Design a protein with these regions (language model features):
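Compact, glycine-rich, soluble single-domain proteins
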Residues: 7-57
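C-terminal structural segments of small proteins and small subunits
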Residues: 56-89
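Intrinsic-disorder/low-complexity, polar/charged segments enriched in Ser/Thr/Lys/Arg/Asp/Glu/Gln
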Residues: 1-5, 60-62
Length: 89
Protein backbone atom coordinates (compact mmCIF):
# COMPACT_ATOMS: atom_id res chain seq x y z
CA UNK A 1 0.00 0.00 0.00
CA UNK A 2 1.14 3.51 -0.82
CA UNK A 3 -0.20 6.78 0.61
CA UNK A 4 0.50 10.46 -0.11
CA UNK A 5 -1.03 13.79 0.87
CA UNK A 6 -2.08 16.47 -1.62
CA UNK A 7 -3.45 19.99 -1.11
CA UNK A 8 -6.43 21.26 -3.09
CA UNK A 9 -5.37 24.49 -4.81
CA UNK A 10 -8.23 25.41 -7.13
CA UNK A 11 -10.72 28.00 -5.82
CA UNK A 12 -13.84 25.84 -6.06
CA UNK A 13 -12.37 22.67 -4.55
CA UNK A 14 -13.86 19.27 -5.33
CA UNK A 15 -17.07 20.16 -7.11
CA UNK A 16 -18.67 17.90 -9.74
CA UNK A 17 -16.13 18.23 -12.56
CA UNK A 18 -12.96 17.64 -10.50
CA UNK A 19 -14.69 14.76 -8.71
CA UNK A 20 -15.52 13.18 -12.07
CA UNK A 21 -11.92 13.66 -13.22
CA UNK A 22 -10.62 11.89 -10.11
CA UNK A 23 -12.97 8.94 -10.57
CA UNK A 24 -12.03 8.65 -14.25
CA UNK A 25 -8.33 8.57 -13.43
CA UNK A 26 -8.77 6.14 -10.51
CA UNK A 27 -10.84 3.79 -12.69
CA UNK A 28 -7.93 3.33 -15.10
CA UNK A 29 -6.03 1.31 -12.51
CA UNK A 30 -6.42 -2.19 -11.08
CA UNK A 31 -5.42 -1.00 -7.61
CA UNK A 32 -8.02 -0.18 -5.01
CA UNK A 33 -7.84 3.59 -4.51
CA UNK A 34 -9.17 5.61 -1.57
CA UNK A 35 -9.22 9.30 -0.76
CA UNK A 36 -9.46 10.60 2.79
CA UNK A 37 -10.17 13.99 4.30
CA UNK A 38 -10.01 14.15 8.08
CA UNK A 39 -11.82 11.03 9.30
CA UNK A 40 -13.84 10.38 6.11
CA UNK A 41 -12.42 7.78 3.69
CA UNK A 42 -14.07 7.08 0.34
CA UNK A 43 -13.54 4.92 -2.72
CA UNK A 44 -11.86 7.14 -5.33
CA UNK A 45 -13.73 5.26 -8.07
CA UNK A 46 -17.07 6.51 -6.68
CA UNK A 47 -18.03 10.01 -7.85
CA UNK A 48 -20.60 10.36 -5.08
CA UNK A 49 -18.04 9.37 -2.47
CA UNK A 50 -15.48 11.84 -3.77
CA UNK A 51 -18.05 14.66 -3.89
CA UNK A 52 -19.15 13.90 -0.32
CA UNK A 53 -15.66 14.77 0.91
CA UNK A 54 -16.65 18.43 0.39
CA UNK A 55 -12.99 19.37 0.05
CA UNK A 56 -12.56 23.09 -0.46
CA UNK A 57 -9.50 25.09 -1.45
CA UNK A 58 -6.68 24.44 1.00
CA UNK A 59 -8.00 21.04 2.10
CA UNK A 60 -5.46 18.26 2.39
CA UNK A 61 -6.47 14.92 0.89
CA UNK A 62 -4.74 11.62 1.51
CA UNK A 63 -4.68 9.35 -1.54
CA UNK A 64 -4.07 5.68 -0.80
CA UNK A 65 -3.80 2.76 -3.20
CA UNK A 66 -3.24 -0.95 -2.86
CA UNK A 67 -2.63 -3.20 -5.83
CA UNK A 68 -0.31 -3.98 -8.71
CA UNK A 69 -0.27 -0.42 -10.08
CA UNK A 70 -0.71 1.46 -6.80
CA UNK A 71 2.20 3.88 -7.32
CA UNK A 72 0.99 4.87 -10.78
CA UNK A 73 -2.56 5.43 -9.47
CA UNK A 74 -1.42 7.69 -6.63
CA UNK A 75 0.96 9.60 -8.92
CA UNK A 76 -1.74 10.17 -11.56
CA UNK A 77 -4.30 11.43 -9.06
CA UNK A 78 -1.63 13.57 -7.40
CA UNK A 79 -0.74 15.17 -10.74
CA UNK A 80 -4.40 15.91 -11.38
CA UNK A 81 -4.83 17.54 -7.97
CA UNK A 82 -1.57 19.50 -8.37
CA UNK A 83 -2.78 20.81 -11.74
CA UNK A 84 -5.78 22.39 -10.01
CA UNK A 85 -8.02 20.29 -12.28
CA UNK A 86 -7.29 22.80 -15.04
CA UNK A 87 -8.93 25.58 -12.99
CA UNK A 88 -5.91 27.52 -11.70
CA UNK A 89 -5.78 31.21 -12.57
Amino acid sequence: MISRDFKISNKLGLHARPSAQITQVASRYFAEVWISKSERRVNAKSIMGVMMLAAGQGSVLTVEADGPDEAQAVDAIGELIASGFGELD
